[in-house]
Amino acid sequence: MAIFTPELWLICFAVTVYIFDYIYTKYLMYKLGAKPITHVIDDGFFGFRLPFLITLANNQGRLIEFSVKRFLSSPHQTFMNRAFGIPIILTRDPVNIKAMLAVQFDEFSLGLRYNQFEPLLGNGIFTSDGEPWKHSRIMLRPQFIKSQVSHVNRLEPHFNLLQKNITAQTDNYFDIQTLFFRFTLDTATEFLFGQSVHSLNDGENSLQFLEAFTKSQAILATRANLHELYFLADGIKFRQYNKMVQDFSQRCVDKVLNMSNSEIDKLDRYFFLYEMVKITRNPQVLRDQCLNILLAGRDTTASLLSFAFFELALNEPIWIKLRTEVLHVFQTSLELITFDLLKTKCPYLQAILHETLRLYPSVPRNARFSKKNTTLPHGGGVDGMSPILIKKGQPVAYFICATHVDEKFYTKDALIFRPERWCEEPLIKKNLAWSYLPFNGGPRICLGQQFALTEASYVLTRLAQCYTKISLQPNSFEYPPKKQVHLTMSLLDGVHVKISNLSIS
């Protein structure tokens, strides 16, 4: 009879691996000056319960509340979870976030994002790492300087279409979030390609593009959530959606490539793609970069507008105060509305946008993966303030949504929507820096943040000029609102409002 059965060999092997990993981990901690992580949450055996808890919370529209609750109940701002036995560091500590996104930027990567997003977005600024990303950044940064994103008058034709859709629903409840996503798709495609898809016109082709772009993004989010098993989220429909979006982009690229530089120079308006052609004539590069920017250009602004309007419709005094400011600065004039005045003469408008981005950041959570054995400044030791070990390949998830409700920075009413806090001296004097990151931070900070803020400012200003009363449909929402978290965040149930009392045309 054999002394060592296959089962016994397997047990011996597992024990040997465990002992070796334990010793190696202790060696790395000693070498790098790290302490054991202070707080560990185990959801069942090896964390097998966590993925199911996350899935349940997500299906209920409560993933963000689930995540924030974990941080609020934790004694420290950084802790470790296990999911299927894999250790994952979670943090809302601004110092750790700054380390990953800036101070130790070169030590962390996007992990498998390229593989997960490539079917739709190709090799662009949001999918690439290292030298390819640096090249993209250098190429794209000049396209988002103030002079390129400050022409607010270009938004008015699209606002007229938005207003037409709203007027058709006067005194009826309707989902304005759907209109905001169409509006930002129209403005983003015009800014990028020089031609809008005009989804607010309800044309068959434009709605097909809208559906394809939206559903493809949802599948990309699933691929990201599957981590190494991303390839399981695939299929004919996914590829059809990608092809429809890419074909539109490619047609726009081909049109511009057939133009000479002299023809492009004669244009009296700025379009992203037309300027990019002066830098490169590689059709693949042009298509991929445009699609990468389109994703952010549509979703970030639509999310901001939707959550802002939800709160404005829920809080009539805030809406009245906004209208008072807008009418004082601009009266009912279109000509008076400029980029500079929106930024400098409308502090309450800007406070509303800041507060919306604080409570409802478009990208509420993100992650980085260590490229080498390294440390993060906080999370270890008795008080959780000592460095912790981050092994090569280990994921670190950071939750901006949890950082943004930290009472240390935003006082005890941090969970309440209160724009006035941004006009009060205590918050003005604070150096929020890495505790307020609606557009990420460090070298990968969002290039289009001024584009998004300008567009949102203009739309809210025009709505305040045009309408005196807005209200949410009773029993159509919960508070806090249910959230859908894909690549960006939106309201799961939409924003069903009634807008009445037209002020001006």
Curated annotation (Swiss-Prot):
It is found in: Membrane. It is an enzyme of class 1 (oxidoreductase). One of its GO terms (molecular function) is iron ion binding. Pfam families: p450. It is a single-pass membrane protein. Its main location: membrane. Induction: By N-alkanes. Its cofactor is heme. It comes from the Eukaryota. GO terms for cellular component: membrane. PROSITE patterns: CYTOCHROME_P450. Heme binds at C446. Its EC number is 1.14.14.-. Keywords: Heme, Iron, Membrane, Metal-binding, Monooxygenase, Oxidoreductase, Transmembrane, Transmembrane helix. The chain crosses the membrane at residues 3-23. Belongs to the cytochrome P450 family. Together with an NADPH cytochrome P450 the enzyme system catalyzes the terminal hydroxylation as the first step in the assimilation of alkanes and fatty acids. This is Cytochrome P450 52D1. It comes from Candida maltosa (Yeast). The gene is CYP52D1.
